[in-house]
């Protein structure tokens, strides 16, 4: 799974990225600080299943803190997007190429109104423009892919009576669009696909937009709510758009994670407070108190909440553990692995995720919590622990 950070220049994308990954990236107060995409590991926060059995997990990837398990996901921070990117303006072509493989967008929006659409300093900027500009550029990107040899492809499809979904999915294969995705959008939007070669430009755009929204869902990370106009703009903008929107203070999250790493405070990502455990100078104490006030107002910094919302609410993935009766691998590690599986995944899908041979030889699975056997068609649930039995 890959999550992509999008947004116009100087909106705080790189700060969000660094706060989520603690990767060493350039953070600067000017447009296009990010040229090449940054790639790092962020983490979704789940309950540590081992805690239900009086144990603590030993993750092979990720980490555990106080009953919370952090499971890794890929996070990309790409070059800032400006109006006209779909036509190559700014770093548009590079930006869009970098986004092809992501599964969902996290749109970082500067709620302060202190920088404009190009990332330059200003005052009282209309924040809603950022959302509509990014929306439109992503829609035009999909439309551009759709229109490549569209008439020729559709006439060929009509003559050969091939499936519309198969033809479109092939056109979008680089963007991870499936035939099932296309069929869903066609049915949901009630589109007539008997003669798509004569679709109007309006219908083409409508289809491209609907396909983009369905195949790459998006959340708004309403960043910089700590700034003077941030909270006011957040409340106003949230009422204008249907996208899920979470108030964020990426700068504060980064400071907390760095202070936690340095042993100055104890902070668990996603919590709404922290504990001071080290000695502070006056400047540090004041800075942390300022961060705490923002966290009280917004119930945290929002960064971890955004990551969890994308994976578990937008993409509807579930976390599942390979779990034998002793919950340990051959080296004594407790529940070392945890996998994020797509919605509606079955016990058999999970077996194949572990290894092809395990899937081929699947007999049944034993649910760690209930101790009951389940068959290959059992739809796995969030925080399931399953032991796969083979022949």
Predicted feature residues:
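Short acidic beta-strand-loop surface patches of small beta-rich interaction domains
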Residues: 363-379
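Loop/turn positions that initiate beta-strands
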Residues: 383-384
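Canonical P-loop GTPase G-domain recognition
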Residues: 145-148, 152-155, 160-162, 176, ...
């Amino acid at each position: 799974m890959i999550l992509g950070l999008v947004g116009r220049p100087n909106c705080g994308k790189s700060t969000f990225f660094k706060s989520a990954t603690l990767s060493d990236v350039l953070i600067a107060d000017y447009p296009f600080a990010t040229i090449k995409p940054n790639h790092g590991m962020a983490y979704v926060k789940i309950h540590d299943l081992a805690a239900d059995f009086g144990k603590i997990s030993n993750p092979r990837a990720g980490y555990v803190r106080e009953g919370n398990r952090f499971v890794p996901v890929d996070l990309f921070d790409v070059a800032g997007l400006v109006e006209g990117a779909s036509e190559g303006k700014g770093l548009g072509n590079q930006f869009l190429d970098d986004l092809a493989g992501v599964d969902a967008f996290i749109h970082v929006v500067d709620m302060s109104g202190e920088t404009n659409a190009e990332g330059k300093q200003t005052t009282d900027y209309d924040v809603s423009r950022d959302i509509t500009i990014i929306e439109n550029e992503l829609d035009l990107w999909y439309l551009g892919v759709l229109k490549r040899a569209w008439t020729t492809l559709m006439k060929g499809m009509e003559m050969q009576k091939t499936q519309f979904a198969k033809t479109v999915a092939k056109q979008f294969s680089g963007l991870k669009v499936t035939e099932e995705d296309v069929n869903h959008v066609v049915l949901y939007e009630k589109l007539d696909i008997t003669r798509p070669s004569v679709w109007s430009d309006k219908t083409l755009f409508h289809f491209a937009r609907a396909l983009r929204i369905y195949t790459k869902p998006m959340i708004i990370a309403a960043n910089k709510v700590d700034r003077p106009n941030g909270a006011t703009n957040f409340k106003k903008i949230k009422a204008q758009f249907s996208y899920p929107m979470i108030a964020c203070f990426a700068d504060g999250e980064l400071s907390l994670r760095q202070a936690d790493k340095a042993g100055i405070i104890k902070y668990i990502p996603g919590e709404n407070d922290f504990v001071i455990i080290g000695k502070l100078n006056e400047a540090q104490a004041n800075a942390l108190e300022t961060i705490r006030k923002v966290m009280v107002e917004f119930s945290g910094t929002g960064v971890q909440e955004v990551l969890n919302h994308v994976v578990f609410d937008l993409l509807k993935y579930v976390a599942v553990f390979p779990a034998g009766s002793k919950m340990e691998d051959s080296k004594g590690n407790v529940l070392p692995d945890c996998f994020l599986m797509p919605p509606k995944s079955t016990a058999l899908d999970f077996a194949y995720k572990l290894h092809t041979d395990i899937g081929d030889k699947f007999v049944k699975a034993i649910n760690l919590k209930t101790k009951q056997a389940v068959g290959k068609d059992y739809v796995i649930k969030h925080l399931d622990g399953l032991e796969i039995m083979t022949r």
